Amino acid sequence: MARNKPLAKKLRLAKAAKQNRRVPVWVIVKTNRKVMTHPKRRMWRRTKLKE
């Protein structure tokens, strides 16, 4: 990817990086392990973003 990115693309990539986190431990504890995963997790090799 280019070193010089448009700001809008950079912000989109940053938002996607922030969303790509595991479910917090306190949520897992609070829901008694019913919620362990979330469907928006993305593997950088398998699923690409629309840019």
UniProtKB/Swiss-Prot annotation:
Biological process according to GO: translation
InterPro entries: Ribosomal_eL39, Ribosomal_eL39_dom_sf
This protein's UniProt keywords: Ribonucleoprotein, Ribosomal protein
GO terms under cellular component: ribonucleoprotein complex; ribosome
Listed Gene3D superfamilies: Ribosomal protein L39e (1.10.1620.10)
GO molecular function terms noted in the UniProt entry: structural constituent of ribosome
Superkingdom field: Archaea
Pfam families xrefs: Ribosomal_L39
Family: Belongs to the eukaryotic ribosomal protein eL39 family.
Protein name: Large ribosomal subunit protein eL39
Protein species of origin: Thermococcus onnurineus (strain NA1)
